[in-house]
């Protein structure tokens, strides 16, 4: 099992022109912790995650991964840090012309030019761990379900053994049963890898299923940061209305 990284973000501000998206945001993720950034669309969740993933520069503030400052980092140092990070984006981004196993092993197979037989064996083992049927190994993405595509994308993410996994709306567009399958797969992945996970979602049920901690973001400001189930004790009226609208049944969720 690999060790997860520590993430520290302090006083983040992000502006696009005159519009400020993040307002002096500070948060952290401890090694191996699963932190969920929860909020409606347009609240700044994706901006926060992209700054942590070095896909977007912050206007002001500091971000450290394992005590290394990544704001203003050199390109060489950036490449080294990026090796620690795995991304699972909202849309799987699988290559339609490649099989399931080729998608999973894309980097090692087509960039590193490693032995195809060994790569296929690694893919088979990972598929088994993530509940991807063996008979799907030669299928193209268009021949499998949306939920299965998410699992294939997750397999592609973790095959490089990242110590920080960033997940962008991993259950968006999936029915409730498949959402639960994906959330269980995410939890098993964290247990197996020990990776730190930072997830953004607007789905409170998913946040409670996969998060140790929940951060609620509203218009670029953090209005809640605490243990996942403590959100039910929050006094903020926006959070109360968010919980009511989500129609959460606590009895069906992990405790």
Residue ranges: model-predicted function:
Residues 53:
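Helix-to-loop junction immediately C-terminal to a conserved catalytic motif
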Residues 117-135:
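Conserved ABC ATPase "signature" region
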Residues 140-144, 148:
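Conserved ABC ATPase signature
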Residues 161:
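Conserved catalytic motifs of ABC-family nucleotide-binding domains
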Residues 165-168:
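Catalytic Walker B motif of ABC-type/P-loop ATPase nucleotide-binding domains
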């Amino acid at each position: 099992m690999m060790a997860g990284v520590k993430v520290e973000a302090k006083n983040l501000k992000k502006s696009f022109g005159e519009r400020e998206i993040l307002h002096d945001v500070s948060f952290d993720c401890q090694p191996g912790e699963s932190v969920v950034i929860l909020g409606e669309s347009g609240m700044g969740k994706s901006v926060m995650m992209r700054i942590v993933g070095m896909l977007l520069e912050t206007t002001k503030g500091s971000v450290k991964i394992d005590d290394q400052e990544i704001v203003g980092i050199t390109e060489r140092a950036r490449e080294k840090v990026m090796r620690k990070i795995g991304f699972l984006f909202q849309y799987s981004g699988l290559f339609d012309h490649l099989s399931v196993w080729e998608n999973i092993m894309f980097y090692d197979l087509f960039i590193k030019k490693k032995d195809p037989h060994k790569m296929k064996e690694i893919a088979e083992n990972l598929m088994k761990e993530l509940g991807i049927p063996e008979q799907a190994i030669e299928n193209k993405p268009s021949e499998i379900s949306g939920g299965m595509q998410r699992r294939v994308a997750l397999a592609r993410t973790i095959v490089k053994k990242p110590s920080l996994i960033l997940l962008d709306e991993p259950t968006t567009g999936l029915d409730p049963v498949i959402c639960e399958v994906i959330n269980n797969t995410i939890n098993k992945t964290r247990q197996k890898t020990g990776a730190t996970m930072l997830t953004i979602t607007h789905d409170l049920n998913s946040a409670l299923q996969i998060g140790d901690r929940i951060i609620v973001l509203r218009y670029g400001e953090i209005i809640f940061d605490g243990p996942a189930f403590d959100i039910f004790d929050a006094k903020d009226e926006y959070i109360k209305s968010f919980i009511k609208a989500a129609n959460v049944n606590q009895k069906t969720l992990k405790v």
